[in-house]
Amino acid sequence: MDDVVAIRNAADTRPRLDLQEHLADLEAKGLLVRIDHPVDKDTELHPLVRLQFIGGIPESERRAFLFTNVVDATGRRYAIPVVVGAIAASAEIYSLGMRRAVGDIGAAWLAAIANPIPPVRVAAPQCQEIVVTGDALRAPEGGMKLFPVPISTPGFDSAPYLTATLCITRDPDSGIQNIGTYRAALKATDRLVVRMVARAGGAGGFLHWQKHKERKEPMPIAIVIGAAPVAMFTGAQKLAIDVDEIGVAGALAGRGVPIARCTTVDLDVPACSEIVIEGLIDTGKLEPEAPFGESNGYVALEAF
């Protein structure tokens, strides 16, 4: 049965709806470097990957990296691997995630935005095979401390950061969800600080936060780590505020994205997500968040 599934998946030329299948595609094409040697997430991991962007390496030689033996500065080993650069480290990697030639990607985006495909709800999602709640989240070595969250720019960043996220929120007035890629600083085993940029026109998540703040109520949020490339692409794309990105992701994929209802908040997430963090944002509280080393080569410093 597994062989039959593998053959069918290989023959399907549509974009993958499972990150694991996408990683297998990258590895098959020589676009994924697997590193089994111990790598320190606090001092080595991101600087190692960043060398291919600042070290004069041609874009055609850029690769995704899969770190299978992650440790921290204290020597702690993590059971969860870390993948970096698997979505858009190069035009070739992005093209593979879209399953389209580079020259066809722009037209594919326009068509997907104009013709979204609704998601498909599933009852027993992969992302809920293991659910951790309550006291287990607050255990000294439990909760999100089990995640090998890297320090992106050692010596500058104020905390370990989740960066390749899908932060999912819902407009309390219209009910339309938004998916945005916002960084999240790990502050405790059960607490993150999320930065939703108040850009021109307003980032969707930030506008939702404003509405919940006006209502004097917390804002439900789901943070997805490790989703299908088409979903990850929409999180970073600047779409109209009233557009539900998951429908655009479905159009890019050529079929509805499987989704599942969260276990503790009224939000839908991609069913094949590797990790989903569910929670509430306290709209009555702000915290200092920067500095943070940005992807385009500068350190963001903000006054609070």
Model-assigned labels for residue ranges:
Residues 2-304:
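Extended, highly charged
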